């Protein structure tokens, strides 16, 4: 830039004129809201502000530095005033950029423009998937109903399974109760078997006692028979002899029947009572023996008694 300052005086005059123009251009820009290089929202409506908009478009295309270089070549040597002008022109560019963006956004909003139609088509395309999505939820809304039904079915199945578990528990309790009853029945059967076994030895002992008593009676009868053929004159000698066999028979009856109970005791005492009865019979037979003719005994086995002297 220093080489450009050293050009001809004509160019210097032109540069001198440009600072005045820059001052004139800067004053309305400041009046429109540009202060210290900051642009307000409203931007510049002056023709000087429109030029920076064109420069911004060139910068947007990537040719803004070339335009800056062409201006010093065509306008001659650039002075510090021209540099200030360039800075002032570059400052309102952001405001113009925002205005252009707003205009570009506002243009598609027009209904007759093709861009609006394309946007409408895109909107319809986007809305159609939304509508399809809206239509899709209807099956999805149906499927939740099915799911709800399935869920209720699962609930019923779970409830049925729960009742089945209850039946299993009841069956288990019933099996335990049956096992307990079976055990009780086994215990009762074992107790009954033990009672039968205990009763069987008792019965056997009772039977042995009864047999012993019967044997004792038969032996007493046999002992009474030899007493009868004795002579009737010796009843006193016969009495102690009869008592002795009766005692021996009683002892023998007690020996074969050790398991006899107290009920068998009268049977043991019976022979003792029968023995005196047997002694009374020979005494009665002794009375008729005093007659001259002897009388034979009632028993056929007994031999005839000798004649008394």
Curated annotation (Swiss-Prot):
<dbReference type="GO" id="GO:0051015">
    <property type="term" value="F:actin filament binding"/>
</dbReference>
<dbReference type="GO" id="GO:0043197">
    <property type="term" value="C:dendritic spine"/>
</dbReference>
<feature type="lipid moiety-binding region" description="N-myristoyl glycine">
    <location>
        <position position="2"/>
    </location>
</feature>
<dbReference type="GO" id="GO:0031589">
    <property type="term" value="P:cell-substrate adhesion"/>
</dbReference>
<dbReference type="GO" id="GO:0098978">
    <property type="term" value="C:glutamatergic synapse"/>
</dbReference>
<dbReference type="GO" id="GO:0061003">
    <property type="term" value="P:positive regulation of dendritic spine morphogenesis"/>
</dbReference>
<feature type="modified residue" description="Phosphoserine">
    <location>
        <position position="26"/>
    </location>
</feature>
<feature type="modified residue" description="Phosphoserine; by PKC">
    <location>
        <position position="156"/>
    </location>
</feature>
<feature type="modified residue" description="Phosphothreonine">
    <location>
        <position position="79"/>
    </location>
</feature>
<dbReference type="GO" id="GO:0005080">
    <property type="term" value="F:protein kinase C binding"/>
</dbReference>
<feature type="compositionally biased region" description="Basic residues">
    <location>
        <begin position="145"/>
        <end position="157"/>
    </location>
</feature>
<dbReference type="GO" id="GO:0033391">
    <property type="term" value="C:chromatoid body"/>
</dbReference>
<dbReference type="GO" id="GO:0007005">
    <property type="term" value="P:mitochondrion organization"/>
</dbReference>
<feature type="modified residue" description="Phosphoserine; by PKC">
    <location>
        <position position="163"/>
    </location>
</feature>
<dbReference type="GO" id="GO:0005874">
    <property type="term" value="C:microtubule"/>
</dbReference>
<dbReference type="GO" id="GO:0044307">
    <property type="term" value="C:dendritic branch"/>
</dbReference>
<dbReference type="GO" id="GO:0005813">
    <property type="term" value="C:centrosome"/>
</dbReference>
<dbReference type="InterPro" id="IPR002101">
    <property type="entry name" value="MARCKS"/>
</dbReference>
<dbReference type="GO" id="GO:0042585">
    <property type="term" value="C:germinal vesicle"/>
</dbReference>
<dbReference type="GO" id="GO:0043226">
    <property type="term" value="C:organelle"/>
</dbReference>
<feature type="modified residue" description="Phosphoserine">
    <location>
        <position position="128"/>
    </location>
</feature>
<feature type="compositionally biased region" description="Low complexity">
    <location>
        <begin position="89"/>
        <end position="98"/>
    </location>
</feature>
<comment type="subunit">
    <text>Interacts with CDC42. Interacts with GTP-bound form of RAB10. Interacts with calmodulin/CALM1.</text>
</comment>
<dbReference type="GO" id="GO:0016020">
    <property type="term" value="C:membrane"/>
</dbReference>
<feature type="modified residue" description="Phosphoserine">
    <location>
        <position position="27"/>
    </location>
</feature>
<feature type="modified residue" description="Phosphoserine">
    <location>
        <position position="218"/>
    </location>
</feature>
<feature type="modified residue" description="Phosphoserine">
    <location>
        <position position="74"/>
    </location>
</feature>
<dbReference type="GO" id="GO:0006886">
    <property type="term" value="P:intracellular protein transport"/>
</dbReference>
<dbReference type="GO" id="GO:0051764">
    <property type="term" value="P:actin crosslink formation"/>
</dbReference>
<dbReference type="GO" id="GO:0005737">
    <property type="term" value="C:cytoplasm"/>
</dbReference>
<feature type="region of interest" description="Disordered">
    <location>
        <begin position="1"/>
        <end position="309"/>
    </location>
</feature>
<feature type="compositionally biased region" description="Low complexity">
    <location>
        <begin position="190"/>
        <end position="203"/>
    </location>
</feature>
<dbReference type="GO" id="GO:0042734">
    <property type="term" value="C:presynaptic membrane"/>
</dbReference>
<feature type="modified residue" description="Phosphoserine; by PKC">
    <location>
        <position position="152"/>
    </location>
</feature>
<dbReference type="GO" id="GO:0001786">
    <property type="term" value="F:phosphatidylserine binding"/>
</dbReference>
<feature type="compositionally biased region" description="Low complexity">
    <location>
        <begin position="271"/>
        <end position="290"/>
    </location>
</feature>
<dbReference type="Pfam" id="PF02063">
    <property type="entry name" value="MARCKS"/>
</dbReference>
<comment type="function">
    <text>Membrane-associated protein that plays a role in the structural modulation of the actin cytoskeleton, chemotaxis, motility, cell adhesion, phagocytosis, and exocytosis through lipid sequestering and/or protein docking to membranes. Thus, exerts an influence on a plethora of physiological processes, such as embryonic development, tissue regeneration, neuronal plasticity, and inflammation. Sequesters phosphatidylinositol 4,5-bisphosphate (PIP2) at lipid rafts in the plasma membrane of quiescent cells, an action reversed by protein kinase C, ultimately inhibiting exocytosis.</text>
</comment>
<dbReference type="GO" id="GO:0042802">
    <property type="term" value="F:identical protein binding"/>
</dbReference>
<comment type="similarity">
    <text>Belongs to the MARCKS family.</text>
</comment>
<dbReference type="GO" id="GO:0046628">
    <property type="term" value="P:positive regulation of insulin receptor signaling pathway"/>
</dbReference>
<feature type="compositionally biased region" description="Gly residues">
    <location>
        <begin position="204"/>
        <end position="215"/>
    </location>
</feature>
């Amino acid at each position: 830039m220093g080489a450009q300052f050293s050009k001809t005086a004509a160019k210097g005059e032109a540069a001198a004129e440009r600072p005045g123009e820059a001052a004139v251009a800067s004053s309305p820009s400041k009046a429109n809201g540009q202060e210290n290089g900051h642009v307000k929202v409203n931007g510049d409506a002056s023709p000087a502000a429109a030029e920076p908009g064109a420069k911004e478009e060139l910068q947007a295309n990537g040719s803004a530095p070339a335009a800056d270089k062409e201006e010093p070549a065509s306008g001659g040597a650039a002075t510090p005033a021209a540099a200030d002008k360039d800075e002032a022109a570059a400052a309102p560019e952001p405001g113009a950029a925002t205005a252009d963006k707003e205009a570009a956004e506002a243009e598609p909003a027009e209904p007759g423009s093709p861009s609006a139609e394309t946007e409408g088509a895109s909107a319809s395309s986007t809305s159609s998937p939304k509508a399809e999505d809206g239509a899709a939820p209807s099956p999805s809304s149906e499927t939740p109903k099915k799911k709800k039904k399935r869920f209720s079915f699962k609930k019923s199945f779970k409830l049925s399974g729960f009742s089945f578990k209850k039946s299993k528990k009841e069956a288990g309790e019933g099996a335990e109760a049956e096992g307990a009853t079976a055990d009780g029945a086994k215990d009762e059967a074992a107790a009954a078997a033990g009672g039968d076994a205990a009763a069987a030895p008792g019965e056997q002992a009772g039977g042995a006692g009864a047999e012993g008593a019967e044997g004792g009676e038969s032996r007493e009868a046999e002992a009474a028979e030899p007493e009868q053929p004795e002579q009737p004159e010796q009843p006193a000698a016969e009495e102690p002899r009869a008592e002795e066999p009766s005692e021996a028979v009683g002892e023998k009856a007690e020996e074969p029947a050790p398991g006899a109970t107290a009920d068998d005791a009268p049977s043991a005492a019976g022979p003792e009572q029968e023995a005196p009865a047997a002694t009374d019979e020979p005494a009665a037979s002794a009375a008729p023996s005093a007659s001259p003719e002897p009388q034979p005994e009632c028993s056929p086995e007994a031999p005839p008694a000798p004649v008394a002297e």
